[in-house]
Swiss-Prot record:
Species name: Desulforudis audaxviator (strain MP104C)
Keyword Lipid biosynthesis: yes
Function noted in UniProt: Catalyzes the transfer of an acyl group from acyl-phosphate (acyl-PO(4)) to glycerol-3-phosphate (G3P) to form lysophosphatidic acid (LPA). This enzyme utilizes acyl-phosphate as fatty acyl donor, but not acyl-CoA or acyl-ACP.
Recorded family membership: Belongs to the PlsY family.
Name of this protein: Glycerol-3-phosphate acyltransferase
InterPro entries found in the cross-reference section: G3P_acylTferase_PlsY
Keyword tags: Cell membrane, Lipid biosynthesis, Lipid metabolism, Membrane, Phospholipid biosynthesis, Phospholipid metabolism, Transferase, Transmembrane, Transmembrane helix
Length: 198
């Protein structure tokens, strides 16, 4: 497989990740820019809070699908480990979307899609951590930060190879960076807790 094909599939994965699902849903449903409402984030949690649970779930499904598609694109080329690069490209696209002038979301739902397609140890660990932290605190941001941070450790302890550990480190670092405003609010006691009601 040529280097050009590899570059093209990574670029395509970035574009797939860049599709701003929550932004598009909010524009279509209410004619609003979701970035000007709630937390200002384009992700599923803010869509849930702003438009209601149904649209929040739709945003979650769409963003998760982007991660799945990116991994499938990488595997289609047949280069070992390329699915990790295309997965990382999708996360980068979601976090810094070319369609939103390089603004974007916090990568959690798209990370879920990527992890669904990788060895299950990281997904199982991250999901358990996320559910436990959310149940104890009702902070989606804290649950997401800790769950993302568990991914490289899960891959390392799961013995699936250094490439997966490096991908996990990338995912964790980007997730923490994208949640820096949430971290500041958590430290100040000003972060909003999640409610299943709109």
């Amino acid at each position: 497989m040529s280097a050009l094909a590899v570059i093209l599939v990574i670029g395509l994965s970035y574009l797939v990740g860049s599709v701003p699902t929550g932004y598009l849903i909010a524009r279509h449903v209410k004619g609003i820019d979701i970035r000007g409402h709630g937390s200002g984030n384009i992700g599923a949690t803010n869509v849930w809070r702003t438009l209601g649970p149904g649209w929040g779930l739709a945003s979650l499904v769409g963003d998760t699908a982007k991660g799945i598609v990116a991994v499938l694109l990488g595997r289609a080329v047949g280069v070992p480990g390329l699915e990790l690069l295309t997965g990382a490209a999708a996360l980068t696209g979601h976090g810094w979307s070319v369609f939103l002038r390089f603004q974007g979301g916090k990568i959690i739902a798209t990370s879920l899609g990527v992890l669904i397609m990788l060895p299950p140890v990281a997904l199982a660990t991250a999901a358990a951590v996320w559910i436990a932290v959310l149940a104890l605190t009702r902070y989606v941001s804290l649950a997401s930060i800790i769950a993302a941070s568990s991914v490289p450790l899960a891959f390392a302890l799961g013995g699936v190879g250094w490439r997966h550990v490096l991908f996990g480190l990338f995912l964790a670092l980007v997730a923490v960076y994208k949640h820096r405003a949430n971290i500041d609010r958590l430290l100040k006691g000003k972060e909003s807790r999640f409610s299943f009601r709109k």
